[in-house]
């Protein structure tokens, strides 16, 4: 069983409000990672992003900051796709003030992804290589092979998030996650979304995953629950090991 970090997903439209700061401070004991979603923003000026990152750092919370630009192709609000997405990531990697960066998997662009991963790691960032499917869950062998292929690019963490349409989909995701945790170098994350897949969030560590994503208020993905509740449920497995 692996140790699971709780990531809280926040998505401020512009600046981080005083209320959001208070919420983060109040729940800090339940949070290991702040996933800062920036795909919903209107401004992507370097100075604006630097100020945003500094605001989080100034809270002096004992957390890592993961910056995510989720494209519309993978279920986000970001309109940057293809080369414009990769060029944006190159600029993002040059900015200081955060700890981890999410890079979306695309099998047709492995050379570009490899370059971005190397650049990010050279800049001192951990890389989460992620793949999302908000419609379905691929079959078990496809899930296992996805982890294998993503691992070959050298990211620190590989993440699959898929939508279950039946109970077997959840079981397949968890089996693929467990297999990956014992067979690849990268640390795996596996999420079965929606209420049906909730067990994948609460029992993430049992199957070898290392991050479970929660929220403070409005869920940023189907099936997310409040970080305080998520931390309590994860601790049940720690207590009863």
UniProtKB/Swiss-Prot annotation:
SUPFAM superfamilies: Aldolase
Record: active site: 132 (proton donor/acceptor), 159 (schiff-base intermediate with substrate)
Gene3D superfamilies: Aldolase class I
InterPro entries documented for this protein: Aldolase_TIM, DHquinase_I, Type-I_3-dehydroquinase
Catalytic activity line of the entry: 3-dehydroquinate = 3-dehydroshikimate + H2O
GO MF annotations, alphabetized: 3-dehydroquinate dehydratase activity
Binding-site residues, 3-dehydroquinate: 35-37, 70, 201, 224
Presence of keyword Nucleotide-binding: no
GO biological process, one term: aromatic amino acid family biosynthetic process
UniProt cross-references to Pfam families, sorted A to Z: DHquinase_I (PF01487)
Pathway the protein contributes to: Metabolic intermediate biosynthesis; chorismate biosynthesis; chorismate from D-erythrose 4-phosphate and phosphoenolpyruvate: step 3/7
Statement: the UniProt record of this protein carries the keyword tRNA processing: no
Entry keyword set: Amino-acid biosynthesis, Aromatic amino acid biosynthesis, Lyase, Schiff base
Record EC number: 4.2.1.10
UniProt family annotation: Belongs to the type-I 3-dehydroquinase family.
NCBIfam families assigned: aroD
Free-text function comment from the UniProt entry: Involved in the third step of the chorismate pathway, which leads to the biosynthesis of aromatic amino acids. Catalyzes the cis-dehydration of 3-dehydroquinate (DHQ) and introduces the first double bond of the aromatic ring to yield 3-dehydroshikimate.
Subunit structure, interactors included: Homodimer.
Name by which UniProt lists this protein: 3-dehydroquinate dehydratase
Organism from which the protein derives: Staphylococcus carnosus (strain TM300)
The organism's taxonomic lineage, starting at the top: Bacteria, Bacillati, Bacillota, Bacilli, Bacillales
């Amino acid at each position: 069983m692996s140790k699971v970090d709780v990531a809280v997903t926040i998505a401020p439209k512009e600046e981080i409000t005083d209320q959001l700061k208070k919420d983060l401070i109040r729940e800090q004991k339940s949070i290991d990672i702040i996933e800062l979603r920036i795909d919903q923003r209107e401004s992507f000026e370097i100075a604006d992003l630097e100020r945003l990152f500094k605001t989080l750092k100034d809270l002096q919370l004992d957390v890592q900051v993961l910056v995510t630009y989720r494209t519309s192709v993978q279920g986000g609000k970001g309109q940057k796709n293809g080369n414009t997405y990769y060029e944006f990531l190159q600029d993002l990697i040059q900015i200081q003030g955060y700890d981890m960066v999410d890079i979306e998997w695309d099998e047709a662009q492995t050379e570009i992804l490899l370059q971005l991963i190397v650049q990010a790691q050279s800049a001192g960032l951990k890389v989460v290589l992620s793949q999302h499917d908000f419609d379905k869950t691929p079959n078990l062998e496809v899930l296992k092979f996805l982890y294998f292929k993503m691992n070959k690019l050298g990211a620190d963490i590989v993440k699959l998030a898929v939508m279950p349409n039946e109970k077997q989909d959840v079981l397949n995701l968890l089996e693929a996650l467990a297999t990956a945790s014992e067979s690849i170098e990268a640390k795996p994350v596996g999420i079965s979304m929606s209420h049906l897949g909730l067990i994948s969030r609460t029992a993430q560590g049992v199957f070898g995953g290392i991050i479970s994503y929660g929220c403070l208020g409005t869920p940023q993905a189907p099936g997310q629950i409040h970080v305080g509740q998520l931390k309590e449920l994860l601790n049940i497995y720690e207590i009863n090991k």
